[in-house]
Amino acid sequence: MTVPFTTQSLQDALAAKLALNFGTEPGEATDQEMLKACALVLRDVMALRGVQTAKETKKEQKKQVHYLSLEFLMGRSLMKNAYNLGVLPELKEALGNLGFKSGDLFELEPDAGLGNGGLGRLAACYLDSMTTLDIPATGYSICYELGIFKQKIVEGQQVELPDDWKGVGSAWLLPKPDEAQAVHFGGTLREFWHDGHLHIVNENSTTVLAVPCDMVVAGYDTDHVNTLRLWDARSTRPVDMALFSRGEYLKASEDEAMAETIAKVLYPEDNHYEGKSLRLKQQYFFVSATVQSIVTKHLETYGTLKNFHEKNVIQINDTHPALVIPELMRIFMDEAGMNWDEAWDITSRSVAYTNHTVLSEALERWPQQLVETLLPRVWQIIQEIARRWQEKVENFFHDPSVTEKMAIVWGGEVRMANLCVAGGLSVNGVSGLHSEILKKDVFKNSYAMEPWKFTNVTNGIDHRRWLSEINPGLDGLVRDLAGGDDYLLHPQALKKLDAYADDAAVLKRLDEIKWQNKVKFADYARKAQGVTLDPNAIFDVQVKRLHEYKRQLLNVLHIITLYQQLQDDPNCITRPHTFLFGAKAAPGYAVAKRIIHLINSLADDISHDPRCRGKLQVVFRENYRVSLAEHLMPASEVSQQISTAGKEASGTGNMKFMMNGALTVGTLDGANVEMHDVLGDENMFLFGLHADQAATLKREGYVPQRYISHDPQMERCLNALRKGFRDGVSYEDLYQRLISQDEYLLLADYRAYCDAERRMAETYENRETWNHMSLHNIARSGIFAADRAVAEYADNIWDVPHR
């Protein structure tokens, strides 16, 4: 890779950019102006390389990967792009020479508001790895104006605020209005015969213009550049000047406002018809624009669609982009004149599906009437796909109950996961356990009929970002022990650290690195939230999307128990213990919001109890996001991965903690199973029911009261929910939810969890043993690198060569 700048040439480029774009010079520029100048200078370099990459891809007729995801949780881009381009040291020095503090400038950049949780972060990691591995790839999503939301905690409760990330973030975007695509909703279908072919046209539809805003993505140690194409929504109709002249200003701009609503926010609330309609519009808008763009570029290169599947593979990240299947069929038949069989043959060899959940409520289903009204032609095609699929299923199984389960359209609903399975060349889960559950339970009949479609690709993380970039102290240790920077392209080189697991000097250095990271995070937390953290305390962390199956509430129950023990015996805790939470709840998820309120109520109670001072602390970090995780991961010592076994598809936070030397307290769920495969019992703190045991317990009749009646400590803990804490709020609703149904088996695992936490705290006191375990975790984390996962996709699903 050619390094684009020296420190001096970078200084000159920044000064020139400030003058040309902002009419100022370094001595007068604001931090915001300098931040944008940095982004624009790096964007220029990447854009030039992107042009060269596209030219080579077209000339050599390389097969291309198209990665569709409703989320791309990119985080901040300046430091990442400078790192990948090999100019991070030069950028820091240049900024210093120009009178700016690089650290302050990096902190000023907002996270790109394009995602919510693990789904979007995975997509971002994979895009980085695809680029680093020199795979011609494009990511596709929506250019959300406000993204998810900015979380504010007010009186202990979550309040959602708009997250306007584009102020600075727009500097990374390259608008391409000349490549805009028209997307049609509603309308009336008219059929006619011409030249022996049936033609179908959609008349009187509402048209929205999808305008691409491209974010260029640099890979590590390569001149290869890929693109994240984000679709912005625009009206095709200008403001009605006649209405405007009459003073009807809102009505004059109605079409414009309705169109732009599509790209306003990620996951609009869908517990009403308008919300469902907007979500479906978002999904079709993003899919239709993407497919049109892919097809247009393919035709420019090859002049035919007959070889589409040979030169393109479309990976759909969960069911949100599932409409890509009927949309491809629509274009192949209605616009390219193919017959059904030819169009289906190409489509079903072009699309691959990654499943990310076993939760039934997350396997999307759309009301048939809504699809029929909004997308009349797509609905016709779905009907025919469903009819042919049902015929195939009936001929294979001869069982009406199986036909019902596998149906794409049934009971007035369109089942998107079944559509993906029917129309995809591949179906993969994201951990070994998850993929087995898909084959044995969720899609067991599909697996029986078409076993060759099903495979596993365990998730991975961008180890360059989540170790080297955010944890320079640990990066230095790895380089010293594992052969320099070789591990950045060959993450399995981390395994070399295993040889030092009993080296006292290495373990002492590892301990010092963790201590410094804790001090650094404590300073960050004080400045950001005004909270005081004791670096001597155990940093026990659970940060992830708030959902009942992830069992933040189980963590809370253990903390309440610990608090009650401390009230009984102030000497029962000798080592300070800080529990750190970070989580956003979906705006309409009332129970999740109540759990956030509970965490903050408990934190407030403990902080005002003098018996807890210097012994027990609970901190909820508001607005958890990628940039906050980057501060927290290096300082974390205990990683809480405690989902109900069989419910978490994989998880990637568990991998990030592991890579930074935190020890896992967890169930055998998701990728924890594969972590256990490489770590063994001795290097993590496992507890609780296994997936098959949990399923059996539920099937045979789970009665929470049986566990309560045999455990006085549990009963006392639960009663605390009813009583509430110093803010006077009762959590009777959560109490009743646990004792009456406890869907995610918190009480069944409560005692084992408390025991696991006790084992962890005891082990923590033996620093040599703890650091020995920590080093093994780091050494064996290389298998969870995104480079490995992307290489598996490339070899086993996409059939594309890679570096």
Regions from the PLM with identified roles:
Residues 1-803:
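A conserved ligand/cofactor-binding region detector
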